[in-house]
UniProtKB/Swiss-Prot annotation:
Family to which this protein belongs: Belongs to the class-I aminoacyl-tRNA synthetase family. IleS type 1 subfamily.
Source organism (scientific name): Pseudomonas fluorescens (strain Pf0-1)
Annotated L-isoleucyl-5'-AMP binding sites: 567
GO BP term, example: isoleucyl-tRNA aminoacylation
Reactions performed catalytically: tRNA(Ile) + L-isoleucine + ATP = L-isoleucyl-tRNA(Ile) + AMP + diphosphate
The protein's name in its UniProt record: Isoleucine--tRNA ligase
GO MF assignments: aminoacyl-tRNA deacylase activity; ATP binding; isoleucine-tRNA ligase activity; tRNA binding; zinc ion binding
UniProt signal peptide: none
Pfam families: Anticodon_1 (PF08264), tRNA-synt_1 (PF00133), zf-FPG_IleRS (PF06827)
Binding site for ATP: 611
Length: 943
């Protein structure tokens, strides 16, 4: 028996079947570093249009988690796809470095008794160390960026830039000092930004408290009565007993109806709608004597239950009837609505009672409760109310309450003198900041679109922005205040520039060690140098000013603007929000043209990641077990507009999909052995019809993928690439060409046509997967035939694909119909194989009984139809001749009959043919194979 294996063009490639990503990816990273890939991209991008994705800086604290990985991978996929689309797309990673979490870490490690200077020194060192760790982890994900020169908010230049940004906002007239209730954390000893507030369930004591009437005649008149026959009181309901000592007013809704209720020993004022529920709660019965609108109660005085002072009734639209009594007790120091209402009625700052100190302890001078921590004072306050006969009811409820994101402890609103950026303050010129910001939102594209309404609602309803903090590790607010008037120095903007120059050289320490006389001269004794620092959201929120202008100036006529900001959905109240406000205050537009929001990671059951649940997926572990490309493929395959489920099982499914794509790439490479595109590439017009279709199909898909990449629809990109590999290539084209590829002459037109198509497909595919499978694409790039540069990323989308000419006989619709026929044949073949009627496709003879139109289509392939169907024989007969045992198919006008071939099997091509053994020199092979070995070789026209 002759061994004909040597006469076949068997596939061969060094591209490994087993990816070994955990070992191979670090080697690829080293190669990128050694060739200076990022620098090369900047060099070739000099004359390209620029695309700027501005990095929202992660906090320089701790190792990265799966959310960080998701965020950075999404950004990297965009940067890579934009680069392949012909843009210069730099990526400058950033880090947020100041703020309480780092200061807290330093205090835990080194103690709280450090001096301010030492604290700042240790914070800077800690942040530097954390950045290095995170940087290594981000690079390991395959993120391509300028990691050698990242931006850090603690860089001296950026600290100075932040001061200059603040100076611009001061110059615009947006900054003011005011007493306002702000989110306050006792553990932080500082105000908190809205984005630093989390809501958790908390148990609180609720109390119904009676405030006795002081103006009896006015109350009687309000209810249309000549006098009050009994003692009367108005009843409030609150979940914060600790605020009762600071009560200064009582709020009713002007349009609600209030009732005067006789309960036997006294009269109570309650919202009419809530009378029944209140009396039930108090365990009493009563009769409504009269009703009056809330507006009739305005300015009637009641008495504080245990202090000798009055509490007037003020009208307020925020009073609700959902719970309580319809009357709100007002402590203006501890509630924003209370504060606003009391100010509206003329209360001045000096009259606002604020007995709670920054640590949560009442001032020592507070009668009854001085020196007590507010949460612990609640029972004492309840006891006092009981003692004076003012407590009508108390119970404990569990409700959602604001907590510090860092300490997980309850917060309060607390009125403090702080610096604010005013939302509705009239600026030096132009619209207010709220108006500017709302307009800017309308001019911004949102992905997904619902983000626009969300951010709009937040801006429309937000209070003034408290930008001052009482901490050490932060960029200073370099203001000098006149000791007598409390006003800013008239040369504040000029002085801020002088401070910025010093900070640029020495860092924020320059301000804290500055002697005021150095800048103010003889004026120094008249001014206080303040010690407040800026909210960290101002740090990151001004990076468009002090980073974009430096790293990649856009040349925008009114200031820098990035093409894209991309972060998690929590950043609508965080970085997107603060950046919008500062951008509109300085440049009167958003610092971004487009906002992309991704959801949070959850497990397969939709639960949040939690160590206690054991469902945490650590990116470091994924890198070490599956490889970063598997994680990248998971990111690409998931619709990021909602929650993104991830688990070991989900990642394993991504690994399975990866293997299918890799195996397709390996098949392409292995069949390009011996192919030199410089000499063997055929022009489109010389290629076989099926090969031309394959290249045309690749071109059409590339256009779709470019559109999906441009719209950041990575899950569509993944789905289409995966389906192309598995169905159109693996299930159709690659299956068909094996016979031609292996059995025809090595340099025959039939084989070179096929290899030309495979080469074009490979050149396109390697680019398509490059934004997602960053490592695998670059590995694949090294194995493709022909001269090429060092990395797939140094190229653009493949331009060698050709479209089928219009009117081409075997065009797109034709091959779609043939594909349907092939699917029908395969389906019936599986049934016959399962029944053991045939062993394999090449043992089968198929007869296709087709109606006229389909018969004409099938006839166009002539005797090459069998190669398309991968059967030894394929015969077409009229539909009406179909015997009773012919099988109907899902293809209209087609029935099939499959039988086992009676002819011998060719030892070379494995087809069962009647001419096997006809040539005495080759008794084991068919005539076609003899011709391919010893003759001129078979000629193919179609497939």
């Amino acid at each position: 028996m002759t061994d004909y294996k040597a006469t076949l063009n068997l596939p061969d490639t060094a591209f490994p079947m087993k990816a070994g990503l955990p070992q191979r990816e670090p080697q690829i990273l080293q190669r990128w570093d050694s060739i200076g890939l990022y620098g090369k991209l900047r060099e070739i991008g000099k004359d390209r249009p620029k695309f700027v994705l501005h990095d929202g800086p992660p906090y320089a604290n701790g190792t990265i988690h799966i959310g960080h990985a998701l965020n950075k991978i999404l950004k990297d996929m965009i940067i890579r796809s934009k680069t392949l689309s012909g843009f210069d797309a730099p990526y400058v990673p950033g880090w947020d470095c100041h703020g309480l979490p780092i200061e807290h870490k330093v205090e835990v490690t080194h103690g709280k008794n450090l001096g301010a200077d030492k604290t700042r020194e240790l914070c800077r060192a800690y942040a530097t160390e954390q950045i290095e760790g995170q940087k290594t982890e981000f690079i390991r994900l395959g993120v391509l960026g300028d990691f050698a020169n990242p931006y850090k908010t603690m860089n001296f230049k950026n600290e100075a830039g932040e001061i200059r940004a603040l100076a611009e906002i001061v110059k615009g007239g947006f900054v003011f000092k005011g007493l306002k209730p702000v989110n306050w954390c006792f553990d932080c000893g500082s105000a908190l930004a809205e984005a630093e507030v989390e809501y958790e369930n908390k148990k609180s004591s609720t109390i119904d408290v009676a405030f006795p009437i002081a103006d009896e005649a006015k109350l009687a008149a309000a209810f249309g009565l000549p006098s009050l026959a009994k003692p009367a009181a108005i009843v409030i309901w609150t979940t914060t007993p600790w605020t009762i000592p600071a009560n200064q007013a009582l709020n009713v809704h002007p349009e609600f109806t209030y009732a005067l209720v006789d309960i036997g020993d006294k009269l109570l004022v309650l919202a009419e709608e809530l009378v029944e529920s209140c009396l039930t709660r108090y365990g009493v019965e009563g009769t409504v004597l009269a009703t009056a609108p809330g507006s009739a109660l305005e300015l009637i005085n009641f008495r504080h239950p245990f202090y000798d002072r009055l509490s007037p009734v003020y009208l307020a639209d925020y009073v609700e009837l959902g719970a309580g009594t319809g009357v709100v007790h007002s402590a203006p120091a501890y509630g924003v609505d209370d504060f606003v209402t009391c100010k509206k009625y003329g209360m001045v700052n000096d009259d606002i009672l604020n007995p709670v100190q920054s640590n949560g302890v009442y001032v020592p001078s507070l009668e009854f409760f001085g020196g007590q921590f507010i949460w612990k004072a609640n029972p004492a306050i309840v006891d006092k109310l009981t003692e004076v006969g003012a407590l009508l009811h108390t119970t404990v409820i569990e409700h959602s309450y604001m907590h510090c994101w860092r300490h997980k402890t309850p917060l309060i609103y607390r009125a403090t003198a702080q610096w604010f950026i005013g939302m509705d303050k009239e600026p030096v010129s132009g619209d207010t900041l709220r108006v500017r910001s709302l307009k800017a939102i309308e001019d911004t594209k949102f992905v997904p679109a619902w983000g626009q309404a969300r951010l709009h609602s937040m801006i429309a309803n937000r209070p003034d922005w408290c930008i001052s903090r009482q901490r050490n590790w932060g960029v200073p607010i370099p203001f000098f205040l006149n000791k007598e008037s409390g006003e800013l120095h008239p040369r504040t903007v000029e002085l801020m520039e002088e401070v910025a120059k010093r900070v640029e050289v020495e860092g924020i320490e320059a301000w804290f060690k500055l002697d005021a006389a150095e800048l103010l001269g003889d004026e120094a004794p008249q001014y206080d140098k303040i010690s407040d620092t800026l909210d960290v959201w101002f740090d990151s929120g001004t990076t468009h000013w002090h980073v974009l202008r430096g790293s990649h100036p856009m040349g925008h006529e009114t200031g820098p603007r990035a093409d894209l900001y991309l972060e998690g959905s929590d950043q609508h109240r965080g970085w997107f929000h603060s950046s919008l406000l500062t951008g509109c205050a300085i440049d009167n537009h958003a610092p971004y043209r487009e906002l992309l929001t991704h959801g949070f990671t959850v497990d397969e059951s939709g639960r949040k990641m939690s160590k206690s649940l054991g469902n945490v997926i650590a990116p470091q572990k994924v890198n070490d077990t599956l490889g970063a490309d598997i994680m990248r493929l998971w990111v690409a395959s998931t619709d990021y507009s909602g929650e993104m489920a991830v688990s070991e099982q989900i990642l394993q499914r991504s690994a399975d999909a990866y293997r299918r794509i890799r195996n397709t790439a390996r098949f392409l490479l292995s069949n390009l052995t011996g192919f030199n595109p410089a000499t063997d590439l055929l022009p489109a017009e010389d290629m076989l019809a099926l090969d031309r279709w394959a290249v045309d199909r690749t071109l059409l898909l590339q256009r779709e993928l470019q559109e999906h990449y441009g719209e950041y629809r990575f899950w569509n990109v993944y789905s289409k690439i995966h389906n192309f590999c598995v169905q159109e290539l693996g299930g159709f084209y690659l299956d068909i060409i094996k016979d031609r590829q292996y059995t025809t002459g090595a340099d025959s037109k039939a084989r070179r046509s096929c290899q030309t198509a495979l080469f074009h497909i490979s050149e396109a595919l390697v680019r398509w997967i490059a934004p997602i499978l960053a490592f695998t694409a670059d590995e694949l790039w090294q194995y493709l035939p022909g001269e090429r540069n060092e990395s797939v990323m140094l190229n653009t989308w493949y331009e060698g694909l050709t479209e089928l000419p219009e009117g081409f006989e075997l065009g797109r619709e034709y091959w779609d119909r043939i594909m349907e026929v092939k699917v029908a044949v395969n389906k019936e073949m599986e049934i016959q194989r399962a029944a053991k009627a045939v062993g394999g496709n090449l043992q089968a003879e198929v007869t296709l009984f087709a109606e006229d139109a389909l018969t004409a289509d099938l006839a166009k392939l002539s005797n090459e139809l069998r190669f398309v169907l991968i059967t030894s024989t394929a015969t077409v007969a009229p539909f009406v001749q179909a015997p009773a045992d012919a099988v109907a198919t899902e293809v209209s006008g087609l029935k099939l009959k499959i039988v086992k071939s009676a002819f011998p099997k060719c030892a070379r091509c494995w087809h069962c043919r009647e001419d096997v053994g006809v040539n005495p020199e080759h008794p084991e092979i068919c005539g076609r194979c003899v011709d391919n070995i010893d003759g001129a070789g078979e000629v193919r026209h179609y497939a």
